[in-house]
Amino acid sequence: MKKRMLVIAAAVAATSMMMASPVMAEDFKVGICNYVDDASLNQIVDNIQSRLEEIGKEKGITFDVSYDNCNADASVMEQIISDFQADNVDLMVGVATPVAMRMQSATEGSDTPVVFSAVSDPVGSGLVDSLDAPGANITGTSDYLDTSSIMKLIQAQNPDVKKIGLLYDVGQDSSTTAIQEAKDYLDEQGIEYVERTGTTTDEVQLAADALIADGVDAVFTPTDNTIMTAELSIYEKFIDAGIPHYTGADSFALNGAFVGYCVDYANLGQKTADMIADILVDNADPAKTAVETFDNGTATVNTETCKELGLDFDTVKKAFEPLCTQVNEITTAESFDEVDAK
């Protein structure tokens, strides 16, 4: 279990009046658990922390943040949440659906609010009654994926596409809705599809090999953390086979996939921090605080992969632009710290 303790503090500016009658800054304990070590989720956590620091300075308060990453291990996740409870945190933050669901269960009947981040289907996963009115002591931010838009990107780049591979982890709640939406869309379009799944990196590698053998023209993966973790080990397989991999997060493109189409995860992290502050500082009721959703529309193209697939980036960009709010470029790396999207 990787554990990191961060104290985000802001000092209240001193005036002669305050020196005569000191004003004590409020202190809030926040426990953040990340589901897995991947670039998009790490970007969310980084932006939650930096935004809380800004809010602390603005309001003259202190956020004591405990951060852990369970690396998709359920027993480790359980221990992290138990530690947060033992530490009497004022609020828990669950990054990704599995963590949010466990936090919801662990805090049921208590006064500890939960804020989730990067949950693709908050209603379908049972976290909230509705996006507008969560109904319990939980709310958060969603990275809902507009699956049909990714399908349209595939068709824009290759109007003659005949068969699409669907690569995902059946155990990832974040993939369930998106995969069904992809099937429905492809059925309507009369495009053949084949499903391959994996729950570990080794299984994902075998699934990628199977899709290549299946002769697919392109591969689609939603915001699936299992596949994201394995991307660095499979992207070259798809390049060698001449198969573009379209995905539901820019971190996939960072790790070698052809395209990542998604929300702005940095902004999502900042908005999650705003929600944390609203609940702790301004006493907002999570049950009545609407889940915040974001416009999809940013396509991030890995220019190195694009070139190796024999595609011209300018041509791809021209095909994508009518379907996107923006088209970004990126090159292959392990983390966003190593490379800046253009």
Language-model-detected regions and their locations in the chain:
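Hydrophobic alpha-helical segments within soluble ligand-binding/sensing domains
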Residues: 121-163, 263-284
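Short beta-strand elements in bilobed, periplasmic/extracellular small-molecule ligand-binding domains
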Residues: 54-77, 137-138, 185-201
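Pocket-lining segment of extracytoplasmic ligand-binding domains
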Residues: 173-249
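An alpha-beta-alpha
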Residues: 30-32, 48, 139-189, 289-306
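Beta-alpha junction/loop-to-helix N-cap segments that form part of ligand/metal-binding clefts
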Residues: 66-129, 224-239, 243-248
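Extracytoplasmic "Venus flytrap"
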Residues: 29-49, 55, 66-75, 171-175, ...
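Sec/Tat signal peptide C-region and signal peptidase I cleavage site
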Residues: 19-25
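Hinge/cleft segment of the Venus flytrap/periplasmic-binding protein
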Residues: 278-342
